[in-house]
Regions:
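Catalytic-site microenvironment of enzymes
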Residues: 1, 5, 9-390
Length: 390
């Protein structure tokens, strides 16, 4: 019903994803000081196991791509790995054509200033691109039907600000490229649907969909056919319909801990897929999902790197190393999930047949908890179990 209503409001035609070209840009790409390294409870700032946008953005994009390709879309990703080029590659400026043979300008070599640019081939011929000018050139060459750049936002470390934000090229309500504003507005309710996080601003029916010039200031390019450094940190330089999404704020401590969990990021990518699919009028999935965060029923989380919004679900201590067992309607244990040690309590089960299931939670020092849940096709059932100390 949501997808149908949005199609009516924005004039989206129900054609589906088959044959559509979707360009996904997981923001950043390396493990440098420019890739938003931030200390977490278990890891120092520049530890590659700590938070970097590089890793979380890629996890989101890979999951979105998995679903889009399954639905018949042609998906191009600016990168599929995280890392650095070797010094010899930097010296030689080696570049290969990407998997779709859309070559960048031949004179455009690897810039030695960008040591976060990745190696050129992931084994499938996929070129790895990080530089913003280079991404813009590739997007303009491919001319995708939909562009999406995935990021997370930043405020002051320890701030409780945490909201979803979508930016297109141009001014608010006046995108430089037709349908960019509509794409973001169709996406919004899907992306906003995350009960595992705590939003500080906006709502499902009050979106933050803005033009980059209106939001950040800058010099309008004068013509959509000119690439200029303007607007939102010069990210939106391309000439194609689409937008950039700041999925949350990694400077909100509990959210940063969640972004260390790959499956939490996959859930965000799944929501983006749903928004893209809705825009093109694609068919709903036949499978459903379960996701949640296991927390203590009585203990509040206290740590210098864990400032939470007062009165929110984030005040309760996430439980590390909790075993979550999934049983089908016959009582057969079909899957299990071990929450990580990163103080987020996240668990998730993907691609489940619709029906009734039972979840059993077991963690050292806590009473066992069992709950029933129903999986619905094309939906994620979110749970927030709280365990009582023994």
């Amino acid at each position: 019903m949501i997808a149908f209503a949005l199609m009516c409001v924005f004039g989206v035609q129900a054609k589906g994803l088959k044959g559509k070209t979707i360009y996904l840009n997981p923001g950043h790409g390396g493990y440098t000081s420019g890739d938003r390294p931030t200390a977490t409870i278990n890891h120092e700032q520049m530890d590659t196991l700590s938070f970097y946008e590089t890793r979380s953005n890629l996890w989101k994009a890979l999951e979105a791509a998995r679903h889009l390709r399954r639905d018949g879309a042609r998906v191009i990703m600016s990168r599929t790995r995280s890392g650095y080029v070797t010094q010899s590659q930097m010296d030689e400026g080696i570049l290969n054509e990407n998997q779709e043979s859309h070559a960048l300008p031949s004179e455009d070599k690897v810039d030695k200033r960008y040591n976060q640019v990745e190696t050129t081939d992931d084994g499938t011929g996929q070129q790895q691109i990080v530089g913003l000018e280079r991404i813009a050139c590739q997007v303009d060459s491919i001319k995708p039907d939909y562009f999406l750049s995935m990021h997370s936002n930043a405020h002051k470390n320890g701030s409780t600000v945490n909201y979803l934000l979508m930016l297109h090229r141009g001014e608010t309500g006046k995108p430089y490229f037709e349908n960019s504003d509509s794409m973001a507005r169709v996406m919004w309710p899907y992306a906003f649907d995350n009960p595992l996080s705590v939003w500080s601003h906006y709502s499902a029916d009050k979106p933050a969909v803005v033009g980059d010039i209106s939001w950040m200031g800058g010099t309008p390019p004068g013509s959509p056919n000119r690439i200029g450094v303007n607007g939102y940190y010069a990210v939106l330089k391309f000439r194609a319909p689409g937008f950039l999404v700041e999925g949350s704020f990694h400077t909100y401590d509990p959210e940063r801990q969640r972004l260390l969990n790959r499956d939490y990021c996959r859930l965000e990518g799944l929501r983006y897929y749903r928004g893209i699919r809705a825009y093109f009028g694609g068919k709903p999935e036949k499978v459903g999902y379960i996701a949640g965060s296991v927390k203590s029923a009585t203990e509040k989380m206290e740590h210098p790197l864990y400032t939470y919004r007062e009165g929110s679900i984030d005040q309760w201590k996430p439980i590390n190393y909790c075993m979550v067992y999934l049983y089908d309607s016959r009582g057969v244990n079909i899957k299990a999930y071990h929450t990580d040690q990163e103080w987020n309590g996240i668990f998730a089960f993907f691609d489940l047949k619709p029906g009734k299931y039972t979840l059993r939670y077991r963690a050292y020092g806590y009473e066992e908890l069992t709950e029933e849940v129903e999986v619905v096709a094309d939906k994620t059932t979110y749970l927030l179990p709280h365990l009582t100390q023994k």
